[in-house]
């Protein structure tokens, strides 16, 4: 998203397992003396209210808390850089929501925090105590104030900061080339644990922030001080205690992450809460204009799909071509359907007659499995002699019909009202070509004289349909396959506005079938709202993710609430929001605070408020700040800001140049000049960052690997909404080499891994490649065993990833091997000492093996990583 004017905010547009065993540093301990008492008074709002636009979102000065995640090495401190432009509201954009990998698949287990007195301004309205802890008047033995003394770094898969410390100096913190921000995900479903609280939270009456482990507590009166606005608040006596140990019994005062859960079946029209996850309906909307080869694959995928559904899942089946066929499950062992015209939107009267008739259009799987198989077996290939792209497809009318049968008889009662149904309903479209008939359609030929206007009209209509689906708590996923051009710009708004995803597949085979199953069963909350609050020194300048501006009437507001509020289109751990932040001024305090609050209804119909609070230390030292930078999180944030501007191939070429300039600027601002040279050394603390960005500029997101603009558009939208783990893999592939004994060694993604006696797995997010060397392939028995081991690992690595990646296996020298080779850094051109420094495994090769490896490469003009860095007049950093 591009930055909007100050008060505008836009969202583009969503966490996989963290890397295990990565330590999380703790912030510096800096005990602060108590500050003198201050009379509490209302604090006026300090941040402008964010405003949103369709493709971008800027927001007020908000801060985002960050919990640590071991796998991704999240840290507790984080610098706050600012863009070079004047502060403005965050920019929000909403590209397609990919079901990427969540931040971490391991559940977060926040650790309890210790308490102690610290600096705070407290009101003199509590005569029994002074803010410095000394007793007065009655001379009670109780300490006056209890406050967090040393925050313990808690592991969290939900928030990742680009650094775990914040620079105090505004000028340095806001260097745009590096930047500061956070990647935030709603995370996994709630699980039993001490973090669950089944009562109303204590919130600041002034700004709306929640009580947390960093709040100062007057244990004599139970008052607590907000860390965001410093307002004093009552606790209705709940926080009155004789010692700080008693306060540790409150999860919100001892854990940085808590889930406030309110249960109860408040939603009409669904079964009890215990069964609600599987009761939300799934409606398949299937293209009937397929040729026989595609149809056979689709039928196999559909049969497997219904067999995988839970018995209580309610299923609907709709076919579309020139007409819309809505299948009736009331006829046992027979495929029976009611047919409506696809030329225009179905009228309310016709749908009412259908729904109130004798037909059953949504039926639980335990009662309709046999009928579903009969319906799929009855499908026939397209018989007319019409090119694929010119066949009439009324997808828009079919989705409208699907929405109508999901709403059912209660639709007219809910007119103008947002009904809260139990769990997200899903419409899954199986498409093999463009929408060319009925509402939202475009002409068969792009040379039609009125095509640009008709395309614009169709895009707007599809976006409105997506918004209507979201209003009725229904997600529309569009799974496309085949070789026919799909006119992605028209289909994309429907998926995006409803909170769904659009995915392209080569065919309707295995990968399509896996995605079909994962689309229907992935956990997703509804009615999501994200609130971000932070210290007054921090400004959120841009938001990228699957959401849009939340209007004030849709959520609770407070007197001086400066929170950035985002309406989430879907609540899934496979998606995330990327927040860019700046310093509003030089920071005087030793810490800054961030608080994220996710409000949503989960799949079990419980209302959940997930609150995450974090305290990051501030530093003057540039070196200390750079050491706290998380290269991977920083690279993902930079990549998302870059991809937001790369809307087409021409933009992508321009963005490669901006990556080059970014590297040069970081070296200039934070590096050092080489003596007696015009070269600059890249900061050694950021040793991994330039290589990650090199992968970005030459990979499928910005490079020339993907040829068709539809594929590029889908990949871009998927990336902008993806969770941290999937985003990282889409930027920089992970390379694993099979070793003797069945183990795998992780190596840099360099072409030096292409050793003829080895097998290599390359995980690039949406694609996983298995490369078998020629020497290994010659031994059929051994290569079969190695291939099986590689496939098993590839499936394990991507087990919960959505969309499911393609897994392709090929031999060295085959035509498909080019997909693998083009994603590896061409390090074979570097001198031996650089190869050994950056790819240590090569030291294990004999001289003969190294010569053989070198001779296997075909020379071409593309620069290696080291050559690229030197072309920018920058000395590459030594690898860690």
UniProtKB/Swiss-Prot annotation:
Binding site for Zn(2+): 204, 207, 226, 229
Record field: compositional bias (Low complexity): 57-70
Compartments (UniProt record): Cytoplasmic vesicle, COPII-coated vesicle membrane; Endoplasmic reticulum membrane; Membrane
Disruption phenotype: Despite normal fertility, impaired pollen coat exine pattern formation with reduced sporopollenin levels, associated with altered pollen germination. Plants lacking both SEC23A and SEC23D are semi-sterile and exhibit developmental defects in pollen (especially at the late uninucleate stage) and tapetal cells, including defective exine and intine, as well as signs of cell degeneration and structural abnormalities in organelles of the male gametophytes.
GO molecular function, one term: zinc ion binding
SUPFAM superfamilies: beta-sandwich domain of Sec23/24, C-terminal, gelsolin-like domain of Sec23/24, Helical domain of Sec23/24, vWA-like, Zn-finger domain of Sec23/24
Biased composition regions of type Pro residues, renumbered to the chain: 20-36
Domain of life the protein comes from: Eukaryota
Keywords from the UniProt entry: Cytoplasmic vesicle, Endoplasmic reticulum, ER-Golgi transport, Membrane, Metal-binding, Protein transport, Transport, Zinc
Location (main, coarse): membrane
Keyword Endoplasmic reticulum: yes
Classification via Pfam families: Gelsolin, Sec23_BS, Sec23_helical, Sec23_trunk, zf-Sec23_Sec24
Region (Disordered): 1-95
GO terms, biological process: anther wall tapetum development; endoplasmic reticulum to Golgi vesicle-mediated transport; intracellular protein transport; pollen exine formation
Comp. bias intervals (Polar residues): 1-13
Region described as Zinc finger-like: 204-229
GO cellular component: COPII vesicle coat; cytoplasm; endoplasmic reticulum exit site; endoplasmic reticulum membrane
Tissue distribution: Mostly expressed in seedlings, roots, cotyledons, leaves, trichomes, leaf primordia and flowers, and, to a lower extent, in mature siliques.
Membrane topology: Peripheral membrane protein
Described purpose of this protein according to its UniProt entry: Component of the coat protein complex II (COPII) which promotes the formation of transport vesicles from the endoplasmic reticulum (ER). The coat has two main functions, the physical deformation of the endoplasmic reticulum membrane into vesicles and the selection of cargo molecules. May contribute to COPII-coated vesicles formation and ER-Golgi vesicle transport. Together with SEC23D, essential for pollen wall development and exine patterning, probably by regulating endoplasmic reticulum (ER) export of lipids and proteins (e.g. sporopollenin) necessary for pollen wall formation.
Similarity remark: Belongs to the SEC23/SEC24 family. SEC24 subfamily.
Subunit record text: Component of the coat protein complex II (COPII), composed of at least five proteins: the Sec23/24 complex, the Sec13/31 complex and Sar1.
Protein name in the entry: Protein transport protein SEC23 A
Organism name: Arabidopsis thaliana (Mouse-ear cress)
Classification lineage: Eukaryota, Viridiplantae, Streptophyta, Embryophyta, Tracheophyta
